[in-house]
Design a protein with these regions (language model features):
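Conserved pre-motif I regulatory segment
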Residues: 1-32
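Walker A/P-loop
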Residues: 26-47
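Conserved C-terminal RecA-like helicase domain
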Residues: 35-38, 81-99, 126, 136, ...
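Conserved Walker A/P-loop ATP-binding site and its immediately adjacent core
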Residues: 42-46, 50-76, 103-104, 152, ...
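Conserved helix-turn-beta segment of the N-terminal RecA-like "Helicase ATP-binding" lobe
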Residues: 63-91, 188-191
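SF2 helicase catalytic motif II
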Residues: 104-105, 114-170
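Conserved RecA-like P-loop NTPase helicase motor core
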Residues: 106, 409, 425-431, 438-607
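Post-DEXD/H (motif II) to motif III coupling segment of the RecA-like Helicase ATP-binding lobe
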Residues: 149-209
Length: 879
């Protein structure tokens, strides 16, 4: 026994995990998925105690390592027990519980020197396996193990292989559900199947997390940035239109080996989009397309030239297929230089549709400074002295320190110190008395009024206080401390908890992981770099309950910069393109795909940007202003936020998270209906024969049975027609066929799962999802349905209709799970045939198949803006 006894009381969801410990550990693995704030570390320590063996605990960072140590001391050790007797943070001095980072473990496994957060250790000549065996370590606990560098992961796999049997505990807030199958299998081989998942809605229901809401505040670029964006678009448009009429460019294309017949069909069809781009260009310039290439294209309709197709043409000309062109005058070198000079080429990639220049302007837009100031004023107006706001940034920007306090100094970068100065100016301008502070690993700035309290909290550390920039030393001071000092973060956090600091600005690296301040009731994510794991952890800082404050609610603010730019169409285009989807917006969209929260317009809990009622492109300034005004009003109504969570959580005693996939009604295969119509026609013929028979014989009593049979048959077929006419029914049958195919192929783990379809009339959409089964099952099913309905791109296998009804696609894609072998693809089709009718399997990697692929891609160009909408949603597990 390890002598660990939990001193608190377990919450219901924690108790459920521990009550099922015997079941979970039967295979030697306990794998728990738990949202930030769920007490995952505490459960992990209890599981280690129940195994009762010396344990090695691996964690991502030094901060989280110290959090584990602190939790053991405060929650599990009795008076008289010494932490140092039980716990070590050094692999060379192991104890019953040894807690180290993955980086230190990797260095020890490979006998390297380790340098991490100021801690240095030389593992040259150190035998890790022998040391662990000497300590009789029999339990391994992995905290967030899938977010590792590849070399660390390899060290972990090598250790498992060499060390022998171990009891394994895996804890994570963010399992890689959406990863490639190979990565998922690698993860499961290491950690075992997931035993239980604790979600954010469950934690809100249990009062472990507070009611909260996400807000996406749309920031407008500065006038200078907006002008740069406009100039870039105008310059691009002028250059592109000049290029299209350039005789040298036209000569280079029209004299290509492709048009002279010197490139074989096999080569042309290896990647058909470059051939398509040439033909589309010829069509746009009203030039003749060779008959053999038109036949190879497989379609009479050629789409309009747009930026996307011109980008493909230039990419092929310069980088992908330059051998197709005889460039005797080196025109392509001049073309490449011109494109680079205009920011339209980077790292051998032509970018006309998406621009890295524009992305960078918007991502780092100084308009976000105004956004942060606006949000601060909104929240202060709502909460006053109760405001506890955390602002997180990617960088400190130490070089700006000398400008702090100078209200006339221009701010040219985003970061901790620019955010602090922006908030200081805003508070000063509006006459607001608020305590601001900066907390990072190397820069700490505090209100002068808290100096004595900080000294009292850190009596063992020699602190110095000095002026910074032009800030009045009576208002703010910079804190100096030895680089080896411990406890600075904890002390400043305590001042924040007490309300002596109301707005804390810091770096995501310091405050994003492991740091805990339950008082935070407003979070501004001014960070634009980082994975979902990090943004999830940052968000987790704001949604914890605050003891003694049962009415706490929290607002999480995301910043996104948008500038409605009129994209000038290319010559000959019929409609204007919308290219407003920038990297900043895509980052926000990816974040929201993973965060379960309240929908603005419905009493539902789901993921996705749509739940925030975010405007749809093309964006207009009036639309953006109206949206920002709406979320300002929503953010102030915290009482309604709590009520809405309560009404949304009355789903059932037991919650289930499902992955919904939206399907357009006109894309659901309709061939079952054709089959029904065939029977309707047949029954009508029989009925007509019956009538003719009656007319000729005029002996009705002798043919009553035929009349009755015809009427019954007609009724049956009409009902069948009406039944299958429903897209709701057709989608459910299609989903069930796909579920059976996945089950038969071993891709689903639970044979008792079932397919359900919901119709959301307000959104004019049908959503299908898998009910029951593991979260991985749900994720895979949603992915497979989404791939089936996705526009044709470059899939390995397609399904092609023998004859498709008007308005229905003649092509569907075989999903990734079934495309590796022909047998798998055929099995997929066999399961679908009863519900979609006569489709045949097309292999797209030979000449005949590539022609069909090209044809299907050309025909699906009208659907180029189709997006497969997926989201997670809370449902009743009993429904």
């Amino acid at each position: 026994m390890l002598g660990l006894n939990f001193k608190g009381s377990w919450r219901q969801y924690q108790k459920q995990v521990l009550d099922r410990f015997q079941d979970y550990q039967a295979d030697g693995h306990v794998h728990l998925v738990a949202a930030p704030g769920s007490g995952k570390t505490t459960i992990g320590i209890e599981l280690i105690a129940r195994f009762g063996n010396p344990a090695l605990i691996l964690v991502p960072t030094v901060t989280i390592r110290e959090q584990w140590v602190d939790r053991i001391q405060t929650a599990f050790l009795e008076d008289g027990q010494r932490l140092s007797d039980l716990v070590s943070q050094n692999l060379k001095e192991m104890k019953a519980l040894t807690i180290v980072t993955y980086q230190a473990f990797h260095s020890a496994m490979n006998q390297l020197q380790s340098q991490e957060d100021g801690e240095a250790e030389d593992f040259m000549g150190f035998d890790l396996l022998a040391s662990l065996r000497a300590q009789k370590v029999a339990t391994l606990c992995l905290d967030e193990c899938h977010h590792l560098r590849n070399e660390w992961w390899k060290s972990l796999e090598a250790f498992r292989k060499q060390y022998g049997p171990l009891k394994l505990i895996s804890l994570t807030a963010t399992p890689p559900y959406d990863s490639e199958p190979e990565l998922w299998e690698r993860y499961i081989r290491m950690c075992g199947e997931i035993d239980q998942e604790i979600t954010v809605p469950e934690l809100v229901k249990e009062d472990t997390l507070c009611p909260h809401q996400d807000f996406a505040y749309i920031c407008s670029p500065t006038s200078e940035e907006a002008e740069r964006l406009r100039q870039f678009e105008d310059s691009k448009w002028q250059y592109v239109n000049q290029l299209l009429t350039d005789t040298d460019f036209q000569k280079l294309i029209t004299n290509s080996k492709v048009l002279r017949g010197n490139i074989t069909s096999d080569v042309l069809l290896e990647d058909p989009k470059y051939l398509s781009a040439i033909l589309i260009y010829l069509h746009s310039q009203k030039l003749e397309i060779p008959r053999n290439l038109q036949e190879l294209l497989g379609t009479k309709e050629v789409p309009q030239l747009n930026y996307a197709w011109l980008e493909t043409l230039l990419q092929g000309l310069l980088y992908q297929t330059p051998d197709w062109y005889d460039d005797v005058n080196d025109f392509s070198k001049k073309l490449e230089a011109d494109l680079k000079a205009r920011g339209l080429v980077e790292k051998r990639q032509v970018s006309l549709v998406k621009s890295k220049v524009n992305d960078q302007i918007l991502n780092q837009s100084l308009g976000k400074l105004s956004g942060i100031a606006d949000i601060f004023l909104i929240e202060y107006d709502s909460l006053g002295q109760e405001l506890r706001q955390l602002v997180l940034a990617d960088y400190i920007r130490k070089d700006f320190a000398s400008y702090l306090g100078d209200s006339q100094a221009s701010i040219s970068q985003l970061g901790v110190l620019p955010y602090f100065e922006t908030l200081r100016r805003s508070a000063q301008e509006h006459g607001i008395s608020v305590s601001l502070a900066v907390l990072s690993g190397s820069v700490v700035i505090l209100p002068a009024s808290v100096k004595e309290e900080l000294v009292a909290l850190l009596p063992q550390i020699h602190l110095t206080f000095s002026a910074v920039g032009r800030l009045n030393q009576a208002d703010y001071v910079q804190v100096g401390f030895p680089s080896t000092a411990k406890g600075i973060v904890a002390a400043v956090t305590e001042l924040f908890q007490r309300g002596r600091i109301q707005v804390l600005v810091g770096t995501k690296s310091l405050l994003g992981e492991g740091w805990d301040a339950p008082c935070v009731n407003s979070l501004i994510l001014g960070s634009f770099i980082g994975s979902f794991m990090l943004s999830n952890q940052m968000r987790g800082r704001a949604i914890r309950v605050w003891q003694g404050h049962p009415d706490k609610t929290s607002n999480i603010w995301h910043l996104v910069a948008l500038e409605p730019i009129r994209i000038l169409p290319l010559s000959g285009e019929k409609e204007e393109q919308d290219l407003n989807t920038n990297q900043d917006l895509q980052t926000l969209s990816r974040r929201m795909e993973h965060f379960l929260g309240l929908a603005y317009d419905y009493d539902t809990i789901e993921t996705g940007l749509d739940r925030l009622a975010f405007p749809k492109p093309p964006f207009k300034k009036s639309q953006i202003r109206a949206y920002n005004e709406r979320i300002k009003a929503l953010s102030k109504d915290r009482a309604s936020l709590r009520e809405k969570w309560q009404s949304s959580l009355i789903v059932a005693d037991k919650l289930e998270i499902v992955n919904e996939v939206a399907a357009s009604k006109n894309k659901i295969p309709f061939l079952v209906l054709v089959d029904a119509l065939k029977w309707v026609r047949f029954s009508l013929i029989l009925f007509a024969l019956d009538v003719l028979y009656i007319l000729f014989r005029l002996r009705l009593y002798k043919v009553w049975w035929l009349t009755l049979a015809c009427l019954l048959f007609l009724s049956f077929t009409v009902l069948r027609y009406v039944f299958f006419k429903s897209p709701y029914v057709r989608l459910r049958l299609l989903g069930e066929s796909i579920r059976k195919a996945m089950l038969d192929s071993g891709h689903l783990s639970d044979e008792h799962s079932r397919v359900q379809v919901d119709e959301e009339k307000e959104r004019y959409a049908l959503f299908t999802y898998l009910k029951g089964g593991s979260m991985r099952d749900k994720e895979l099913f949603a992915q497979t349905i989404g791939e089936f309905f996705a526009p044709v791109d470059n899939q390995r296998y397609l399904l092609k209709a023998e004859k498709a009804p008007a308005g229905q696609s003649a092509y569907f894609a075989v999903p990734t799970l079934f495309e590796k072998r022909k047998e798998d693809a055929q099995k997929f089709l066999d399961y679908l045939t009863p519900n979609i009718g006569q489709y045949r399997l097309v292999y797209t990697r030979n000449e005949a198949g590539r022609k069909i692929l090209l044809e299907s891609r050309i025909k699906s160009l009208s659907n180029k803006n189709d997006r497969i909408l997926t989201k997670k949603k809370v449902k009743s597990a009993l429904k």
